[in-house]
Structure formats: C-alpha cells, structure tokens
Amino acid sequence: MGCGGSRADAIEPRYYESWTRETESTWLTYTDSDAPPSNAAPDSGPEAGGLQAGVLEDGVSANGVPRSTAPGGTSNPEKKMSCGTQCPNPQSLGSGPLTQKQNGLRTTEAKRDAKRTSAKEVTINVTESIRQVDRNQRITKKCIN
C-alpha cells in the first residue's frame, strides 16, 4: 500500500473528523488506479483505445482531475496522493486544484454543521396515563406512571 497500512485500516480510519465522502472517493480512485493492469485482455489497454480503471472516456478521472498516460503504461507523475489519510504527512503538491477543492469542501461542511446545530428545540409532552388496548379496541388496563 505504500504507507504500511492494511485495507481494513483504510476502511475504518483513525482520523474520523477528517474522513469525508470526498476523501473516500479520492482514496478509492487512487488506490484502485495504482493496481497494475491485468494481462487477461492485452488489447483493451489505453494504447488500444480501451479505458483505464477510474478514467472516463475524455481522459478525466472519476473525480475530475485530468490524467494522461505516458508510453509504456506509466501513470501521471503529478498524482497528488497515493495513500489517502493513512500517511502521517500527506504527499501533496501544495496549491494544486485538488487542495483548493478540499478547502472549499471543508468550509461547506462547516456551514452545514452549523445549520444542524441551530435547529429548533422541540419539547415532547408525555401523557401520564397509558391505555392498553386489546385486539377488539377495548381498554383493558389503565396504568399510571
């Protein structure tokens, strides 16, 4: 995996507050595309007009980052991260479009969390007596709490 963690560690991350759907999709995209291409269908690779895992027809990966393939099947050297949130020091190139997108996502989540906490309080009044009814809709007992 590159950072020494297992796939189970990635599914249940240690840093819950930083794990978002964006992080999960980024992790899944990059780890799935790191796998070497299978030799079962040699004429379905990118050189023969086929598609690479995680890459759409127009050469853009599933998360919107443009990708290119060099001759020989090597992947783009500008890949931002290869191991998700499991590395203690994420390998990022700084002020790329992916970093800016994540910062925008964090501010959106903060606004969304603020809306959740500012919900109206609801008071529920419970009646003091509970009536038990049988199948014939007759009151059988009258209990007082």
Swiss-Prot record:
Major localization listed first in the record, in broad terms: cytoplasm
Subcellular location as annotated: Cytoplasm; Synapse, Synaptosome; Membrane raft; Postsynaptic density
Modification(s) after translation: Palmitoylation and myristoylation target the protein to the lipid rafts.
Keywords tagged on the record: Cytoplasm, Lipoprotein, Membrane, Myristate, Palmitate, Synapse, Synaptosome
Compositionally skewed regions (Basic and acidic residues) per UniProt: 108-119
Listed Polar residues bias regions: 83-106
UniProt-annotated stretches for the region Disordered: 27-120
Lipid-conjugated positions (S-palmitoyl cysteine): C3
Protein name (database record): Brain and acute leukemia cytoplasmic protein
Gene: BAALC
